[in-house]
């Protein structure tokens, strides 16, 4: 595995860099705009592999994406290779339909320490929940970013990441009440502790999320990529685009259903993804939102 190949994959062309917040932010933004957050393997009859070598091959060499256990694992490796002080952490995702956090640790995220300050770095939550900048590990501090305001709160050594969102305009009235549309302006995202983790700690989650009938990844196919203006998602056979702040304090959210014949072209043009096997889009009862 070669860090230069990773830099080429994300379009990062700075041969001389400083291990500071500006560099960390730049790497995060390059990765999130070139590497999709996706689970397409599962809907092409393939497994989501946890190993770093397999992840590097899929994302860097084959120019695919992956889910958090792959995409953030790659980011953790790259930042460590660059010389950043990194710690792998595990998160518990907030499940909106049941109004509670997952009982299992199913999200991988990264902590980076710079000049005695700690930051949460996450390139693989996807949709409009994706941070565009590292979030400083400071309890109760509102941290405005392009997608939304992010807020971390610490209670009894557990940290909670929340998001304060803008109003939104949906031109296609067919989707105003759709489950694909995030309707909360205050959104809980996930919780985590600062206990260091290894990739082996996620083996159960990697299996569970691929086989459980209540796993959103089993129920729904998705592909999400951040853009210069917002985010583009393919959820099942619906393409959704959110433009952040298209006017003051309002996001524009557009939806369009695409035919099976259009899917391959959408994946190539919107996400830069070419699949080796036949893809069967799926949007079940458990779905993602934008």
Curated annotation (Swiss-Prot):
Annotated residues for binding of CoA: 103, 208, 287
Modified positions (N-acetylmethionine) in chain numbering: 1
InterPro entries found in the cross-reference section: Arylamine_N-AcTrfase, Arylamine_NAT_domain_sf, Papain-like_cys_pep_sf
E.C. numbers: 2.3.1.5
The UniProt record lists the keyword Cytoplasm: yes
Active site per the UniProt annotation: 68, 107, 122
Keyword hit for Cytoplasm: yes
UniProtKB keywords: Acetylation, Acyltransferase, Cytoplasm, Transferase
One Pfam short name: Acetyltransf_2
Protein location: Cytoplasm
GO molecular function: arylamine N-acetyltransferase activity
Catalysed reaction equations from the record: an arylamine + acetyl-CoA = an N-acetylarylamine + CoA
Any GO CC annotation of this UniProt entry: cytoplasm
Binding-site list for substrate: 106-107
Family of this protein: Belongs to the arylamine N-acetyltransferase family.
Job of this protein: Participates in the detoxification of a plethora of hydrazine and arylamine drugs.
This protein's name: Arylamine N-acetyltransferase 1
Gene: NAT1
